[in-house]
């Protein structure tokens, strides 16, 4: 039961961090900094 809880927490944290990372990476794309990448 403890292993299942740890697995669930790991998956939740993974998706939350992935969502936050995607949100933060989308912010600079709208800024003029995108021209530097191109």
UniProtKB/Swiss-Prot annotation:
Keyword Zinc: no
Membrane topology: Single-pass membrane protein
Presence of the UniProt keyword Protease in the record: no
GO biological process per UniProt: photosynthesis
Alphabetic keyword roster: Chloroplast, Membrane, Photosynthesis, Photosystem II, Plastid, Reaction center, Thylakoid, Transmembrane, Transmembrane helix
Location of the protein in the cell: Plastid, Chloroplast thylakoid membrane
SUPFAM superfamilies named among the record's database cross-references: Photosystem II reaction center protein I, PsbI (SSF161041)
Pfam families cross-referenced by the UniProt entry: PsbI
Superkingdom classification of source: Eukaryota
Principal location listed in the UniProt entry: plastid
UniProt cross-references to InterPro entries, sorted A to Z: PSII_PsbI, PSII_PsbI_sf
Annotated TM spans: 4-24
Assembly and interaction partners: PSII is composed of 1 copy each of membrane proteins PsbA, PsbB, PsbC, PsbD, PsbE, PsbF, PsbH, PsbI, PsbJ, PsbK, PsbL, PsbM, PsbT, PsbX, PsbY, PsbZ, Psb30/Ycf12, at least 3 peripheral proteins of the oxygen-evolving complex and a large number of cofactors. It forms dimeric complexes.
Its biological purpose: One of the components of the core complex of photosystem II (PSII), required for its stability and/or assembly. PSII is a light-driven water:plastoquinone oxidoreductase that uses light energy to abstract electrons from H(2)O, generating O(2) and a proton gradient subsequently used for ATP formation. It consists of a core antenna complex that captures photons, and an electron transfer chain that converts photonic excitation into a charge separation.
Name this polypeptide is given: Photosystem II reaction center protein I
């Amino acid at each position: 039961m403890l292993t299942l809880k740890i697995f669930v927490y790991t998956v939740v944290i993974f998706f939350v961090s992935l969502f936050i990372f995607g949100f933060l990476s989308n912010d600079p794309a709208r800024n003029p900094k995108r021209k530097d990448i191109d």
